[in-house]
Swiss-Prot record:
Xref: SUPFAM superfamilies: Flavoproteins
Superkingdom field: Bacteria
Protein name: Protein NrdI
PANTHER family: PROTEIN NRDI (PTHR37297:SF1)
Gene encoding the protein: nrdI
Taxonomic classification: Bacteria, Pseudomonadati, Pseudomonadota, Alphaproteobacteria, Hyphomicrobiales
GO MF annotations, alphabetized: FMN binding
InterPro entries assigned: Flavoprotein-like_sf (IPR029039), RNR_Ib_NrdI_bac (IPR020852), RNR_NrdI (IPR004465)
Length: 134
C-alpha cells in the first residue's frame, strides 16, 4: 500500500487519526516543510483551518510542501479533517488541494474521526492503492 503524508498541528487531531489507521505514514514538519521531500506516491491527510470564511483553509506548512514540484508530482489523493460547526467550509482544505493538484478528494472526517471513519478510510485506501497498481 502507498504512503500517507500528513500534517498535524499542536492539537494532534490529525496525527491521532493517522496513527489509528496503522499504515505507513510521514509527517510534514511544523517548520522547514520546504526541506521535506517525498519521492513516492502518497495520499495527503490534512486538517482544515479557518474561522468559517474559507480563507487560510490549507495550513501554510502544507502549502510550502506542495509548492515543491517533486512533492506535488507524487500526490495521488487527499483526505481532509475539519469541524462541521463551520458549515460550508467543513473540510475545505480537501476541496482546495483536490482542485489545485487535480487529484481526487477521497474522504473527510470530523476532528479526530470515529472508529467508523478509520475503518472506511483504511478500506478505501486499500482499494484506492490497488486501483493505482502500487
Amino acid at each position: 500500500m502507498g504512503l500517507i503524508v500528513y500534517y498535524s498541528s499542536r492539537s494532534e487531531n490529525t496525527h491521532r487519526f493517522v496513527a489509528r489507521l496503522g499504515l505507513r505514514a510521514a509527517r510534514i514538519p511544523a517548520s522547514g516543510a520546504d526541506a521535506f521531500h517525498i519521492r513516492e506516491p502518497f495520499v495527503l491527510v490534512v486538517p482544515t483551518y479557518s474561522g468559517g470564511d474559507g480563507k487560510g483553509a490549507v495550513p501554510k506548512q502544507v502549502i510550502r510542501f506542495l509548492n515543491d514540484a517533486e512533492n506535488r508530482g507524487h500526490i495521488r489523493g487527499v483526505i481532509a479533517a475539519g469541524n462541521s460547526n463551520f458549515g460550508e467550509t467543513y473540510g475545505l482544505a480537501g476541496d482546495v488541494i483536490s482542485r489545485k493538484c487535480q487529484v481526487p478528494y477521497l474522504y473527510r472526517f470530523e476532528l479526530i474521526g470515529t472508529a467508523e471513519d478509520v475503518a472506511k478510510v483504511k478500506h478505501g485506501l486499500e482499494r484506492f492503492w490497488t486501483r493505482q497498481q502500487l
